[in-house]
A protein has these predicted regions:
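A secondary-structure capping/hinge motif
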Residues: 223-227, 271-281
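Hydrophobic side chains within alpha-helical segments
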Residues: 72, 237-240, 267, 274
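Long, low-complexity intrinsically disordered regions
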Residues: 218-223, 230-233
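Short, basic, alpha-helical segments at the C-terminal edge of helix-turn-helix-like DNA-binding modules
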Residues: 233-242, 282-285
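Positively charged N-terminal leader segments that act as targeting/secretion signals
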Residues: 5-7
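Alpha-helical bundle regulatory/interaction domains
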Residues: 2, 12-198, 202-204, 210-214, ...
């Protein structure tokens, strides 16, 4: 019988409050509608469930959110591309989305396309995905090849006929069937500290707080979270900054540079652009 994580609950509460799912450019806001749902049984592991209904076939730019996703394309098909690259990748109908280090574009094949996103809490995908998570970095992997099962294929056509709560119930039942109990990890402490400090952390201090050597921290963090602590901190940091820019588009970059603790504005701009592909000044244009 499935059990709640018990001792992980405190860590999850530390990590969950900063999750940012998607930041869009202003001209993309009307290309789809979203409907948010709460998990039924897996609230300690799943941060959110979002249904996206696309109103046209325009591409949408998504910024990396720092979490693993399960994606179920319920209607239509989609292609994906890294920002500023011309090649497009066809996405499987059901897939595991690993951590992304750069923004990417998603394009539906038609108006009316739908997809469901299951977003894991930070450091919680490891309870369900049967492999080292760094193997999924910047990748989308067919769900059946990851879990070695055809369980979900039997429901593919039926998903569109079901009410959304029944779809969620079936997906959660599948996740419960592949759940693996794991001991508490010092990486939970590191992830919590990264979110608490909005990604502005020193890796050596992070290792010390986690009672690990820097090299051991990097190895375990890669395997349990999906990328290095330095890369992950950057994603959390840029999401924090993107949130500020979205809420306060009138903010002066010079003032923000020093409020955030950057050495100079050039460093700030390069840090932001390395993830989003645009400078902070152009982010809201």
């Amino acid at each position: 019988m499935f059990k709640s994580p018990g001792p992980y609950s405190t860590i999850h509460c530390v990590c969950c409050y900063i999750i940012i799912t998607i930041v869009l450019l202003p001209d993309q806001i009307k290309t789809y509608k979203t409907y948010n749902y709460s998990p039924l049984k897996l609230g300690n592991y799943i941060a959110g469930i979002t249904l996206y209904q696309f109103t046209d076939d325009s591409p949408v730019m998504l910024n990396p959110g720092g979490y693993f996703e399960l994606i179920f394309q319920l209607e239509g098909s989609f292609v994906q591309s890294v920002v500023h690259q011309d090649s497009w990748q066809i996405r499987p109908d059901f897939f595991v989305g690993g951590l992304h280090s750069r923004s990417f574009m998603v394009k539906p094949d038609k108006a009316g396309a739908k997809l469901l996103s299951i977003q894991f809490r930070p450091n919680c995908a490891r309870f369900f995905i049967p492999d080292r998570l760094n193997l999924f970095k910047n990748k989308i992997e067919d769900l059946e090849s990851v879990f070695k099962t055809r369980f979900l294929s039997r429901f593919h056509e039926g998903f569109s006929q079901l009410k959304m709560l029944e779809v969620i119930r079936k997906i959660e039942s599948f996740l419960i069937s592949v759940y693996r109990e794991k001991p508490m990890s010092p990486i939970d402490v590191a992830v919590g500290d990264i979110y608490q400090k909005h990604g502005f952390v020193n890796i050596d201090q992070l290792a010390q707080k986690s009672c690990l050597s820097p090299s051991h921290l990097r190895k375990r963090f890669n395997e349990e979270v999906g990328m290095s602590p330095k890369e992950y901190s950057k994603i959390v940091r840029i999401n924090h900054i993107a949130g500020i820019l979205s809420r306060k588009p009138e903010v002066h970059l010079t003032e923000l540079t020093y409020q955030l603790g950057y050495f100079d504005q050039a460093h700030f701009i390069n840090d932001f652009k390395s993830v989003t592909g645009v400078s902070p000044g152009r982010f809201n244009q």
